[in-house]
Amino acid sequence: MNIKIIGVGKLKEKYFRDGIAEYLKRMDKFAKVKIVEVADEKAPENLSEAEMADVKAKEGDRILGKIKDKEWVIALAIEGKQRPSEVFAKEIADLGTYGYSDITFVIGGSLGLSPAVMKRANDTLSFGKLTMPHQLMRLVLMEQIYRAFMINIGSPYHK
């Protein structure tokens, strides 16, 4: 299985990079995991609705440029589908069973994802109504993907 995580912006803090590196190492035996960063659009404070839409569209174009046709895309969004870890694990396993070996997760920038990215997504995922920095969301997502693999092999990691 190939898993790609596309995120807007760079990870600046070493502790986030270290956490992600740890989960990349742990998942190496289950999947090939690739992190892809796309540039965030520099935007001043107090943007108008039109300016916010323009920022999301530009970031969205960069994201879409990193997605191949055959990839199953899951967009992370506050309004996405919430599910327990066990259900998420089963969905990941089922995707592999049904021939989707390339799964791409997309994390937007500070303004969220563009309508074009949401339209391209095959599914959505939400970890709740909380707003989180995209750097933290990458780490949380990595842990949940790892947890899914642990659930699927019956490991005591998930209690």
Curated annotation (Swiss-Prot):
InterPro entries found in the cross-reference section: Alpha/beta_knot_MTases, RlmH-like, tRNA_m1G_MTases_N
CDD domains referenced in this protein's UniProt entry, alphabetically: RlmH-like
EC top class, as a word: transferase
GO cellular component annotations of the record: cytoplasm
Family: Belongs to the RNA methyltransferase RlmH family.
Listed PANTHER family: METHYLTRANSFERASE (PTHR33603), RIBOSOMAL RNA LARGE SUBUNIT METHYLTRANSFERASE H (PTHR33603:SF1)
Full protein name: Ribosomal RNA large subunit methyltransferase H
Organism (species): Lacticaseibacillus casei (strain BL23)
Gene: rlmH
